[in-house]
From Swiss-Prot:
<protein>
    <recommendedName>
        <fullName>Large ribosomal subunit protein uL13</fullName>
    </recommendedName>
</protein>
<dbReference type="Pfam" id="PF00572">
    <property type="entry name" value="Ribosomal_L13"/>
</dbReference>
<dbReference type="InterPro" id="IPR036899">
    <property type="entry name" value="Ribosomal_uL13_sf"/>
</dbReference>
<dbReference type="GO" id="GO:0005840">
    <property type="term" value="C:ribosome"/>
</dbReference>
<dbReference type="GO" id="GO:0017148">
    <property type="term" value="P:negative regulation of translation"/>
</dbReference>
<comment type="subunit">
    <text>Part of the 50S ribosomal subunit.</text>
</comment>
<dbReference type="GO" id="GO:0006412">
    <property type="term" value="P:translation"/>
</dbReference>
<dbReference type="InterPro" id="IPR023563">
    <property type="entry name" value="Ribosomal_uL13_CS"/>
</dbReference>
<dbReference type="InterPro" id="IPR005823">
    <property type="entry name" value="Ribosomal_uL13_bac-type"/>
</dbReference>
<comment type="function">
    <text>This protein is one of the early assembly proteins of the 50S ribosomal subunit, although it is not seen to bind rRNA by itself. It is important during the early stages of 50S assembly.</text>
</comment>
<comment type="similarity">
    <text>Belongs to the universal ribosomal protein uL13 family.</text>
</comment>
<dbReference type="GO" id="GO:0022625">
    <property type="term" value="C:cytosolic large ribosomal subunit"/>
</dbReference>
<keyword id="KW-0687">Ribonucleoprotein</keyword>
<dbReference type="GO" id="GO:0003735">
    <property type="term" value="F:structural constituent of ribosome"/>
</dbReference>
<dbReference type="GO" id="GO:0003729">
    <property type="term" value="F:mRNA binding"/>
</dbReference>
<keyword id="KW-0689">Ribosomal protein</keyword>
<dbReference type="InterPro" id="IPR005822">
    <property type="entry name" value="Ribosomal_uL13"/>
</dbReference>
Length: 146
C-alpha cells in the first residue's frame, strides 16, 4: 500500500511561479474564478487544500474588464464613512472608471474560502489598471485566458 505524500512548505515555495494575465476583454467573474484557482494551486498535481501551494499572479489592464448584463448600471458597491448617514454607493460603471484594480482584487478575494489561508493567498495577487507594472524582475509567464 502506498503512503500519502504531503507537500512541504519548502517544496511549495521552491516551485512557485509568476504568471501575467491581460484582463482586457475578459468577463470579471470568469477571470476571478481562474485567478483564485491559480493562486490556490488547484492546477498542480500536488495540490494540498491546507497548504499555500499556489503561484503569484499579475493582472494588468483591469480597467478594460467586462461586466456582463446590466451590472454597470444596476449593481452597486457600498461602503460607509463611519459618520451618521455616511453610506456611500458606487455603480459598476464608476468602479471600472475609478477603482478597477480594487474591483478585480475584491472579485478574486470573494472567490477564495473564508479562512486564515486565504488571507495569505490573496497577497499573491497583484492588480494594475493599465499595462505598466513593476514586476518585470520576476520574469512572469504570459497566460492567455481569452
Amino acid at each position: 500500500m502506498q503512503k500519502t505524500s504531503m507537500l512541504t512548505k519548502e517544496e511549495a515555495i521552491k516551485n512557485r511561479k509568476w504568471y501575467l494575465v491581460d484582463a482586457s476583454g475578459l468577463v470579471l467573474g470568469k477571470l476571478a474564478v481562474k485567478a483564485a484557482n491559480l493562486i490556490r494551486g488547484k492546477n498542480k498535481a500536488n495540490f494540498t487544500p491546507n497548504q499555500d501551494c499556489g503561484d503569484h499572479l499579475i493582472i494588468i489592464n483591469s480597467d478594460q474588464v467586462v461586466l456582463t448584463g446590466n451590472k454597470k448600471d444596476n449593481e452597486f458597491w457600498y461602503h460607509h464613512s463611519q459618520y451618521m448617514g455616511g453610506i456611500k454607493k458606487t455603480s459598476g460603471r464608476d468602479m471600472i472608471n475609478k477603482n478597477s484594480d480594487k474591483l478585480v482584487f475584491n472579485a478574486v478575494k470573494g472567490m477564495l474560502p473564508d479562512n486564515r489561508l486565504s488571507r495569505r493567498l490573496i497577497t499573491k495577487v497583484h492588480v494594475f489598471k493599465n499595462d505598466k507594472h513593476n514586476m518585470e524582475a520576476q520574469k512572469p509567464t504570459l497566460l492567455n485566458w481569452s
